[in-house]
């Protein structure tokens, strides 16, 4: 299948995760890969949007669409650690984009890597694991 934005291969995902040099970098890479969130949604994420009981994140995306994103155990770990003494993510979209690019360069991944490529990678992985197309559209807000 040809993609406009080339998703990362499994080995590239592993190398990208290993290249993270701090908790914050690991949070950014893992949450984007595990949820398919837009960079702007991560940058605006607030503690009150997370349902720890239902393992999901409620976000408002493009066009004011409200949607619920399932939260994996890994995402839950990173967000619960981050939000111990914070109420919201304290990074801007541009900063997150720069961090993702820097980690990809450190990992020596040759293809273009951006938060949107991580979102696309999430979608492709979801479908390869047998995920439902309609459910994926709901998660991504399409």
Where do the language-model regions lie?
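Conserved catalytic core of the tyrosine transesterase superfamily
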Residues: 1-142
């Amino acid at each position: 299948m040809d993609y406009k934005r080339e998703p990362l291969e499994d080995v590239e995902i592993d190398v990208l995760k290993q290249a993270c040099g701090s908790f914050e970098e690991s949070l950014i890479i893992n949450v984007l890969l595990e949820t398919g969130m837009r960079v702007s949604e991560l940058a605006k994420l607030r503690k009150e949007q997370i349902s720890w009981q239902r393992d999901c994140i409620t976000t408002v995306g493009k066009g004011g669409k409200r949607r619920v994103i399932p939260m994996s155990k890994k995402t839950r770990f990173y967000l619960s650690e981050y939000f111990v003494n914070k109420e919201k993510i304290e990074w801007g979209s541009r900063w997150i984009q720069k961090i993702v690019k820097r980690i990809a360069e450190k990992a020596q991944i040759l293809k273009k890597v951006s938060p949107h490529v991580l979102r696309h990678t999430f979608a492709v992985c979801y479908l390869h694991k047998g995920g439902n197309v309609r459910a994926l559209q709901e998660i991504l807000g399409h």
